Amino acid sequence: MKTRFIDLKAVWLIMVCALCLASCRNNDYVRSIPASATAVMRIDGAVVAQSDKVLSLLPFGDKVAEALDLSRDIYAFETIDGNLGMCAKVKDSDRLLEIMKKAATSEVRRQGDYRLADINNSWAVGFDDNALLVLGPVSAAALPDAQRSLVRMLKQDEDASILARPMYSRLDSIGSRVALVAQVQALPEKLAAPFMLGAPKGADASQVAVAAGVDVKDGIMRIDCENFSFQKSVDRELHKSHSVLRPIKGDFKNCMSQSQLFALFANVNGKDFLPLLQSDRSLQAVLMGLNTAVDFDNIMRSVDGDIAFAFSGMSPDNPGMTMLARVDNPVWTADVDYWKQSCQPGCSITGSDGHWTYRSGDTGFSFGLQGDVFYGTSGVSPAQVQHLLKPANPIPADVSRMIQGERMAMVLNVKALVGNGMAAGSMSGMLKPIINNVKAVVCVMKFKK
């Protein structure tokens, strides 16, 4: 009996070792992703295999699927200098070489165990029998440097790769078929602002991260995400701030029009929420102009309920911002006459009876009350205020329904975002193959209890 027990134990140990070795082999191509990556997305290979639209958007087309092992995950990543990358497991390097010879702009060359190519003078490609790497877009002059970077990545050991980073461990723990973990600095600035809410003053976007699971159904991409930090002190402050956000009632869920780029929804007590806004540098930059004309901080203190910020433009000079908020006891209305008298030269505040307009040169901003709703927006007359609450072309109901009951949500108008050049050159560029034909993106913030 003892001998049999020893034999079973030996078999068990052998099986464990075999599983560990198999696990290492499964991840060996992932070590090509650099440890310095600021964002990493994992896409289940089955998702790619089932969609001919994902790989067809790559610079060398969907034929590359014949040479890849789509039983393994495909990874997209952003390098520290802002380039986008892709990493995939190679199944047939000979077939991959044939495909690259037809797709490459110049001749595929060999460097040791690696093959190097460029596509359209802007994408660097490197591969061996194990991994395929793509990096770009870069200028034609920068292609040699990009290819040298690919060789270093293909050569690097696990300690120099993303596998050694907590970012990868976090990514690996997300159960969605499409998942990502990113430093907030990898996001466009305006989209990054909500994820920085609650971060301590002095913390920058490289110290705060986002973990997200992605699902697409009926043309809507839903992203369930959480902001956090690998630095305990920063993470603690982020977690503390989450209690300020209350379940959204849905008062303004139908107020976003299809002409707007994105909108942020929450439910707050303004007195508690104001310190978070004041510590968020990106949002403060947007709101600073208002504070020079009116006492926006005092307006915010009157907020108690649902609040929504929507943006139709992205430049600092023209954010095209609209704000709607449920208010209680807005005592600041008694100060409007003082604001009128205190305007700087060249500026003015006009209006009465709950509707006022601030003007400075060619720019204008209207604000006021519609019942117990505060509104503030660029260039709206009193007769047009109703269109803010009931736009003629609101976002689809199946999109707006996802907002209600959450504690913070963002809705992104995909066509408008792509049209404004926001779906390339940053982490949002990673989503481009997946958001193809998606009508809207709903990003819901989840918080630890």
Predicted features along the sequence, with ranges:
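Single conserved position on a long alpha-helix in the C-terminal lobe of the eukaryotic protein kinase
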Residues: M41, E66-P166, G305-V399
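Post-signal peptide N-terminal segment of mature Sec-exported envelope proteins
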Residues: R31-K53, S71, A76-F77
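Leucine-rich, highly hydrophobic segment in Treponema pallidum outer-membrane-associated proteins
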Residues: E158-A263, I403-K449
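C-terminal motif of bacterial Sec signal peptides marking the signal peptidase cleavage site
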Residues: C20-S23
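Hydrophobic lipid-interacting interfaces of membrane-associated proteins
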Residues: P137-A142, S173-E189, F228-F230, N269-K271, ...
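Long, K/E/R/D-enriched contiguous segments that form extended
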Residues: Q260-Q341
